[in-house]
Amino acid sequence: MGAGLAVYRGLTWGLGLVLPAAAGLGRADGAWRGALTGASAEGAASAGSIWVHAASMGEVGAARRWVDALVEAGVRPPLLLTTRTRTGLERARREMPGRVAARIAPLDLPQTVRALLESACPSRLDVVETEVWPNLILEARRARVAVVFVSGTVSARTERRLRALGVAGPALLGNGVFALARDDEAAARFRALGIPEARVRVAGDLKADFPSPAAVPAEGERVAVVFGSFRPGEEATALAIAEALHGMGVEEGRPATPPARPLLVVAPRHEEGAARARRLFAGAGYAVFERGAAERSVETLPAWLSRAASGARTRVAILSTHGELPEAYDHARVAIVGGTFAPFGGHTPLEAASRGCPVIAGPYHDAVARALGAIARDGGAAIAPDPASAAAVAASWWRDGGFAARSQAALRAARSLGGAARRGLEALEAWRLVP
């Protein structure tokens, strides 16, 4: 074991002796208390099954497709699913009832990870995308539980951080660790970090494994431009698009009915984003429609969108609920890819593309470059260098009559990138990791 890894183990072991005493300071149902808990009812309920770990809400969405594939392949539910955020936990429990026993992931302390492994006795640990936590991996290996990175990706920043900390290499990622990489670049990074070539396969991106809709809504049913996964720093883009769309239709002499009047729907990535969007648009003088849990309980999303789009003054709506963004894309003529107009690397454009919705992305799209490139090559996506350009493209696409061609291009690209779950299961068979 290298010096960096030994130091990390020593420090976290010491923290594991004192931090659990602080668990009582948090709410009984809070993430803090859950993160300091090892053995749990969820572990016992899923004993002997597979442990799936997904960092946050976005990864939980990918994990859902993996869990569905595992259960359909014969894995006995419930599986254990852990996540590090409250919103991720809520999504897992809402979207996978009966299929997973979900809880907050333990902190990366040897004692808490070991206790959960001992209570759950998983047959395998599947880490969705990238969460390289040394104790999680080492304790799983110690318990002879294979670790598989699923839809795995390693950014250049993560690789540099692991090397700087001195925790990369076969001491961490040696025997018992496998990678189902998202693409060739990720596969090369996993190999460089210490996973042998024979235990690395390119399987693809789980976020591309979206079910094909039974029918793609026609242009006339699409009343909105949807800014999905809106992040801090993207306010200028959202405001520029709102201004470009404001007043279209009536001023151009077109009928004052949807979809002649574009509705901008902003769906924040995190809860605090709703307040930020509210302040932004209210400060600019827009009448803002908002959908939260209360509205969701009494009105369907299509009805809410139709009502917002037909309002005399409403030009902007905020979607504050969790789990409704995919359905919102069914009613969008244009999707703006969040996390690409501020340095976050981008969120998947495939969720919108798989619904037949063309996408516009900004300059910060390195994390989704492959998917975005595939959609753009056939005309289903555009890359805008700045907020003004994004607004101009959105306005042009709204009225130029090219929706059908762009929609079909986006659908074709999304379907061509699917199959990650199937290829992953085939690799597990070859590695003899199927329980």
Q: Where are each of the predicted segments found?
A:
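Hydrophobic beta-strand scaffold residues
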Residues: 145-147, 288, 359
